[in-house]
């Protein structure tokens, strides 16, 4: 019997208009994976933050056309992925999108999946490196919202936990970096979205996987004495976040009169953190010191990146295991100390 496969792409989401900035912020900060407090306290805090940050965030989104570009780019990725898969498999399949904090929300996506009536579901996060705050939150939210009809049918659900070392994912980064390399006197800053230190200390493998990705890229670049560093951006509030900060390292490079190449290492789509934070705010720091500032594009619809997603899906489609949760390499990448990882512990 022919399989009928529902593939779900997860991403963060973003406001599709300035009016939707406040509800987007509320949804973000109301997520227990982001603010781990009981209700009604979490609800109150999310309400306060969304009110306080609304106007500032609206000004930021005004700089990029008054809305997030994330959904449009994810739709383009979906179309390319669908086209590629149709060339390679005979099974019936459909690719769905589920944004965590904006439309299409989880219930809308699940209703579409129900109409499609799949024989199995594959969950593919557009977060290469796992975090409990991104992939973990999206997968949990999806599974919690599956209603009784789907649950009682016992449809296999296969989950791609992460793919920080996927071969074509690494090659896609390397190809984009090589296009922009200078001859001399530059440093590469691999800029990832920051997380509070307490989340990492609680067993989240995010920073470990970021390091693994960067290590693989640097090895593939094969540049002798390459000057590079992993940095973190987008910190919010007074608590301790992962360090070093991207803006501080740009400042340091400026003082040393060293040109900067920025690689957005944890983002696979252009959105406010790349288009405003990296392209506008951080570039001003480089301009102050009159150093060259080059920002590598996100992987987006890069052909090699789409190939990497395709290869991951092919592997999972061919697996007979039901309710599988593993990395793209079918093994647990993280040491056992990272207890928030979705994969089973290593033997």
Curated annotation (Swiss-Prot):
Its main location: cytoplasm. Keywords: Cytoplasm, Heme biosynthesis, Iron, Lyase, Metal-binding, Porphyrin biosynthesis. Pfam families: Ferrochelatase. It is found in: Cytoplasm. GO terms for molecular function: ferrochelatase activity; metal ion binding. GO terms for cellular component: cytoplasm. PANTHER family: FERROCHELATASE, FERROCHELATASE, MITOCHONDRIAL. This is Ferrochelatase. The lineage of its organism: Bacteria, Pseudomonadati, Pseudomonadota, Alphaproteobacteria, Rickettsiales. The gene is hemH.
């Amino acid at each position: 019997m022919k399989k009928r496969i529902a593939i779900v792409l997860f991403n963060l989401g973003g406001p599709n208009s300035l009016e939707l900035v406040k509800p987007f912020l509320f949804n973000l900060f109301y997520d227990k994976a982001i603010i781990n407090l009981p209700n009604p306290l979490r609800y109150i805090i999310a309400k306060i933050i969304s009110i306080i940050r609304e106007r500032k965030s609206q000004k930021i989104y005004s700089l990029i056309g008054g809305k997030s570009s994330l959904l449009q780019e994810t739709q383009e990725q979906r179309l390319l992925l669908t086209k590629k898969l149709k060339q390679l498999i005979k099974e019936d399949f459909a690719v769905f999108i589920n944004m965590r904090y904006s439309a299409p929300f989880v219930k809308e996506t699940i209703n579409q999946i129900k109409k499609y009536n799949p024989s199995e579901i594959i969950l593919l996060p557009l977060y290469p490196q796992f975090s409990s705050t991104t992939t973990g939150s999206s997968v949990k939210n999806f599974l919690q919202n599956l209603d009784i009809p789907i649950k009682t049918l016992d449809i296999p659900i296969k989950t791609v936990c992460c793919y920080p070392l996927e071969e074509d994912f690494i090659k896609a980064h390397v190809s984009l970096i090589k296009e922009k390399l200078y001859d001399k006197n530059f440093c590469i800053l691999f800029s990832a979205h920051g997380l509070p230190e307490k989340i990492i200390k609680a067993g989240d493998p995010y920073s470990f996987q970021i390091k693994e990705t960067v290590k693989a890229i640097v090895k593939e670049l094969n540049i002798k004495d390459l000057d590079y560093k992993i940095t973190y951006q987008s910190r919010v509030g007074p608590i301790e976040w992962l360090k070093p900060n991207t803006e501080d390292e740009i400042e340091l490079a400026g003082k040393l009169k060293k040109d900067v190449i920025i690689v957005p290492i944890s983002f696979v789509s252009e959105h406010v953190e790349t288009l405003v934070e990296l392209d506008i705010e951080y570039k001003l720091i480089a301009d102050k010191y009159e150093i060259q500032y080059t920002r590598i594009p996100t992987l987006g619809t890069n052909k090699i990146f789409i190939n990497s997603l395709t290869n991951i899906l092919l592997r999972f489609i061919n697996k007979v295991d039901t309710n599988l949760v593993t990395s793209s390499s079918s093994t647990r990448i993280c040491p056992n100390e990272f207890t928030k990882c979705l994969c089973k512990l290593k033997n």
